[in-house]
Amino acid sequence: MQPNQLKRPSLNHRFEPYTLKHLTICKRCEKEIIGVSNSAQICYSCKNIYHTRCCKEIETKKLELICLGPPKKIKTVWKIALIPSLFKSLFSKSKVIVNYSQQLINEKTFTLEAIKIWVDVMRVDNDRYIQITKYYDIFDEEVFNYIINMIIEKDINLPMVNIEFPVDLHSSVQQNQYINDQAVSQEQKQQQQQLQQQLILQQQQQQQLQQQQLNESYDNSTINNLNYSNDISNAFSPRSVFSALELSSNAQVMNALELSVPFNEDDNNDDSTLSASTYNRRNSNKNKNSNKNNTSSSSSAPASASSSKHSNLNESFSSSTTAAAIVNNIDNSNNSNNLAALSPRSTASTTTTTTTTTTTTSPKSNNHHHHQHHHQNSKSRKPSTIIINKKKIKSPKNKSSKRYMLTEQYKWSTQMIGLQILYRILFNEKNMIHFLNDKFMAPLAVLYPILINRLKAISLGSDNNNNNNNNNNNNNNNSNNNNNNNNEDFKLLSINCKLLISILNRMLDFETLIPLFFTNKVIESIAKVNSDRESLRGKLSKDEFEVMDRVVLLLGKYFHLEPYHSLIERRPEWIDMIINYSVEHKVGILHHEITRNEVKINVEIYDSPLCTVYSGVYNGMDVAIKEFSQDGMGFDWVSFYKEITIVSASQHPKVIKCYGAHTKNTNKPFIVTELCSRGTISNALNQIRKTTGQPPAIPLIVHMAIDAAQSLEFIHSKNIIHRDVKGNNFLVNENWEVKLIDFGVSRFVEARLGYTIVGTPNYMACELFNGQPYHQPADVFSFGVVLWEMFTQDTPYKNLTRIEQALFVQSGGRPTIPPTVPTTIANLIESCWVQTPHLRPTFTEILKVFYSLLTPPPDNEHLVPVVTRLFNSSIIQLKILKYLDTNTLLNCGLASRQLRYNLYNGISMEKKTFSNFWIKLMNFSKSKFRYELLSPSERKNDSTGSSPIIMCIQPFSPNSQSKNNNNNKNHHSDDIIDDDDDDDDDKTYPSLVIPFSASSPTLNINSENKNNNNVNEDKTSDTSSNSNNNNNNNNNNNNNNNNNNNNNNNNNNSNNNNNNNNLRQNQFLGNDLNKSQDNNQLMDGSGGRRDRSRSKSRSRSASPSNNHLHDKSLMGLLSSSQTSEIGDNNTNNNSDNEVDNNNNNNNNNNNNNNNNNNNNNNNNNNNNNNNNNNNNNNNNIDNNNNNKDNNNILSSENNNNTTVIEQQQQQQNVTNNNSNEPKNSNNEPKNSNITNNIVNPNVFTTTTTTTTTTRTTTTTVYDGTGTLNNLLFKINDGGIISSDSSNSLSDPESEEYSMPIKRSSSIRSPGPVSAISPLFKSLSPNLSPIVPNIINGYSFENTSACD
């Protein structure tokens, strides 16, 4: 490469925003880029990553940084043998084991037990390796599992740290373990209290002699009782064990508990880790100080070169039974012997010992102590005594004891080590595979709220910067030490919390695994902490709150998609978080943004100082446009965003439907809702009185009251209080349906009840006038006043002023109920405005009263209302799933709500019909994730798994009324490995229900299959021919049969047997059709005369290939044509020949001619083959005649039901039959009309056809009134179903028939809606054979995906 190409100007950098998934160092400033904030830019030429601010400086100041182009790819191969080097490089940066990392971890000692002991003993509260080490692209599964267990098991499973050692330890170490095991005994608690009292008395009386008194007290009470030996092996604390001992390759480290923490002279912020240089300096200072004070004797033997390496860090130790500091008087004669015994590689050396004291000195010694600290902070240090601060942290076991089990803090440090390692892995696809296990993900997510609760329990205090106050007053000393310890615990916990939420945040980058995050409590845990974020102000960083906000945005993104909508809707606190986020950031995340050009404003309907309402047109619909002015009185963006978010989150048939809002770059925002032309309730009822001269009918008022009560019941179920229930906030549309509006003053129920007086005085409850806290019963009181208005058409308190009205209501006064109101309604109104709030009924109870008025108990117990029958029968529920995309769902009707409820129950509850629903959804997402890891070449050769396609339902999509794109796309087939051993059709799932659906395997027709004896060739050709014309199918079938006859005579003999069986099968099919006609159940919407492709799908569904004959036949009515898996040859031959026989129903003469021609060809080849083929033809003729008789019976009974389109199809068939003659004289199959890829019709794919037609089918539906109403359904090429009660064809391009599925690049076209029918078979595989008799009158037309 030339030099001028190497040195390119800075303008050649192509900076683009980059989302960090690992720790990165900026190329310019060489500082760490925080992965949480995502403030990074990447140059796609040189692949270097910079801070955003550094990129701006490069561009503005025109800094000439060299862009070397794409870097060379260096392939790094990691092996299991390199993992010890990984741990060694990670922890060699630690200040604790600078000189001992080589001895601890190597290839010989790399075991999980060694890592467990090593990592547990480590203390890295504030270590340097956090900024130095890199991220790792290797993670062995065994090590990953161990680290996860190290993080979670001590909090999720075990209350304390318990380590099992493989071999016996040293005797002195066992004694130390005995001290820790007996730490919580009651006897030692009493000893601790006695020692505390003795220390207080001794400190007050003899301050100058306290050092000697403490030594005597310890020697008499602690050392003698516990046989504590003074040797070097006692230095077993996590902070000093590696500084005191040199471990051999097979040495075992003891996990002992250190319960007294030395004051760090080097750094006030780090009192838990010690470096080698700090240890040497401190040891020399202690030696000088001990010689100066003459507190201990020391040997004069010179120290060797390794004495600093093996010298003892003279920290004082204390078990949890002692409250005072423990002074270690170490004998010189025992030090070298024990050191040599424990460390074989160490040389004999003498160690100078010191006595560490805890003193409370006089003012004179205070000044001296202050002078020492002054010099310690300078460059030249003078010897000084070490002040040991006693640990006084509240114990989780016994808070009153003021003691602290160091296992908690020790455990947190262990967690931090594991979290640091986990935080440093590259969160790429290779490493994320380990997180697909819910066994690890769920406990890791649950751990975060546990750590947050501990963080909240810690009370922060000011740091103790003045040591003089500690020495003057013992009580102040204890409290300040408590604050210091709390601050230390808070610092340690805050690091763990930040690491853990950063790990969870990186997982959320993989949106393919979103279903997994809803299941394994990742989203639930973060949302739970976010709901209590006010109490965490000051304890969590800004980056952590940004991660919580990201989860809220994720909930808003998936709110309109099923099944997430049902999951989110069941959590009112999640909806509350979405609303609070919209209010806080002044942004709407649930509504659809509408521009001003998309709406057409017509006339003004209503005007007030707050807003102006216009009637208009949006997307071809009559809508109401509620416009605000930013300069208007009382306008507030916070209230505006709150209203549109609550309306978007509260979509219900009885709540005003919101189509979107205009909020960006405008001074006059507006909200687009459905138009209610009749105005408010009072206006609509008064209009009846004016036009008819009579009061409104009571049944009409009851129906309107039911609508109003249903809307309030819905918002109360979401923990919303409307707070302004009045007649003007209920609008009536053209169909006399009541809709609830005006959520501007609504709010979600919080932990504390509200005291703010909000509402209209005429409707306000008495507790609001009294200033008492109010809850949802306040809306019930207001609704009682609305009922009084509806049944009296009058205004309450019209003769009273506001003050008189308030006093009247507080004293128990209510409006008078006239006798014209029915008694039941009058009693209901009186119960709604009872003075005591908790005695008022709920809206569920109110609705029961109204329902009893409309639908009294029937005399005959078998006469059940149609709604009850509809939603209590699992079979009918499955049938309704076929119509998921009709206008009923678009309008959010009762069926939609119930269906979504059933879907939610199938996800969240254990039911037999939905037992594997969510599990299969998880498998789909995991399979998609693993499939994306494959290279393009590997994907082509991959036969085990493929990428599922995202498909979700949008029941409440803001733009659900927009026009639908009817573009047919060819989709690749998917084959997902299913671990469940269920039925044969377990690979087909409801794509409209499952967000990640997969299709069945694709059958490819290759040239090598032409001469194959397998019957699959017949099946393939038959299926492919369905998309073109039927006569060519017969030719291809006959040609293929000729090939088989020429190859093998036995093949023809088997076909003869199968054809004989087909005679009985077709006879059964004809009888079954006759029975269906007698029962007035239209098996096919065309009156029995159907095209060949539809009769194919029908006959294949009704094939009695196994013992579940009735189940299979019923499945043919409920589901589309399905390509079953290839079983044994006999079964396949039966099904294929049966299809061939049914294809002959329309054109028997042509089929016979084709058969004769093919037989002539066979005679020229082989006489034996000719005989076999003649037998085949004879059997086929018999079968065809039998089928012709059956079809004649059907056609004679249904001649009047033939539609215009069917007549055209018949004429077209006749034309095709006349023009279709066998042109292929050879024995090769005719493949001109055979498609290359045959897609399973169970999935949302459509077969391309030469002509586009619109067919109409008549479906009989029982409406509960005792009559059968015929609904006309129209299905166009895009699979759009529309209904029209007038039995007239309407425009297929009209907007009112559009589907509610949002189109995007990642979501494929759904195809025919009836493809949802595979759900029936997966949900209820064993349907009762008598179901058609039970659901008389409920017959639904089957629409095949291949039609």
UniProtKB/Swiss-Prot annotation:
> Boundaries of each Protein kinase domain copy?
599-854
Catalytic site: 724 (proton acceptor)
For molecular function, the Gene Ontology terms on record are:
ATP binding; protein kinase activity; protein serine kinase activity; protein serine/threonine kinase activity; zinc ion binding
Compositional bias segments (type: Basic residues): 366-382, 389-402
The protein's Enzyme Commission number:
2.7.11.1
Q: Do you know which Gene3D superfamilies this protein is assigned to?
A: 3.30.60.20, Phosphorylase Kinase, domain 1 (3.30.200.20), Transferase(Phosphotransferase) domain 1 (1.10.510.10)
Listed name of the protein: Probable serine/threonine-protein kinase DDB_G0288147
Which organism does this sequence originate in?
A: Dictyostelium discoideum
The taxonomic lineage of its organism, from the top, reads: Eukaryota, Amoebozoa, Evosea, Eumycetozoa, Dictyostelia
